[in-house]
Amino acid sequence: SSIGIHNAFTHTFKELGVPSPDAKTIRGFMGPPLESSFATCLPKEQIAEAVQIYRSYYKEKGIHEAQLFPQIVELLQELSKNYPLYITTTKNTPTAQDMTKNLGIHHFFDGIYGSSPETPHKADVIRQALQTHQLAPEQAIIIGDTKFDMIGAQETGIKKLAVTWGFGDEKDLMTYQPDWVAHQPADILRQL
């Protein structure tokens, strides 16, 4: 979803009439709550408007710009045979649901959990999924590509499988001492 996210951020800054941060800075916005990202470069009074512009663009265009990494459909097919799969994301739930439907992967997941004002951080969303499905932390593993995934896992006591493709920086991921590391989708199947 990085293309759609990047485009949504640049569109938002353009609509607000302010210079867009560089691509590296925008890449760093992928993972934390939108409000936190916008707070690093906009005045407080513009944050709510920025979030609204971003979400409107992302809902209309951004989710259609998302693409799956190679081998992900095959990975989801295999994992869903043996494990219940859930998405925990800092996107809001309807957007995440729309995106999975658009990508043709919605049917692989037993639940999709996104952020809300009550659950703004990754750990909050993970806790919501664990509680809803009555899972103990030791029964869950996060497969994540950002430090925010690793932090959310640490804060909730679940195991961490870091993937080195995607948004995150491999060096950043390693600082959170993941239980497993996957450099390609097939590595996940070998490690679980």
What is each residue range found by the language model?
Residues 5, 34, 68, 122, ...:
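Conserved donor sugar-nucleotide recognition element shared by glycan-biosynthetic enzymes
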Residues 106-120:
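A short, structured active-site edge motif that brings together acidic residues
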